[in-house]
Amino acid sequence: MTNPLKGQIEVTLGSETYKCRLTIDSLVKIEDELDTGILELAQNIAQAKVRIRTLLVVLRHALRGGGNDFDDKKVGQIISDIGIVVASTEVAKLLVATLNDNDSDEDDKKKALE
């Protein structure tokens, strides 16, 4: 079971469901590896301007953050098995879930009740 309060989410890749987590540290590593800001990366995926290497890097960091032991070869095989379109969709969902600021929504709800 995942813990959304810790930023964990489940991602279904083919017939398997994995725990994933992108921390600030992993987001910085992704930006460094791809030489692209995380928001620009998310926009590019939304506009179908995505490279397979981008999918591989984001998935590798997310899967490792969820406690899975994956290397580029294994992540590449998953992408090959499920297809680029499905992989792009799952990476987009993962980034949206990570970048979405749910805490501010909770603060707004608390203030409205006061």
Regions found by a protein language model. Give the residues of each.
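Charged interaction scaffolds used for protein-protein
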Residues: 1-17, 35-50, 67-114
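Short linear motifs in exposed loops
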Residues: 21-22
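Short, hydrophobic/amphipathic alpha-helical patches that form generic packing surfaces
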Residues: 56-64, 90-93
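A short, polar/charged loop-to-alpha-helix boundary motif
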Residues: 29-31
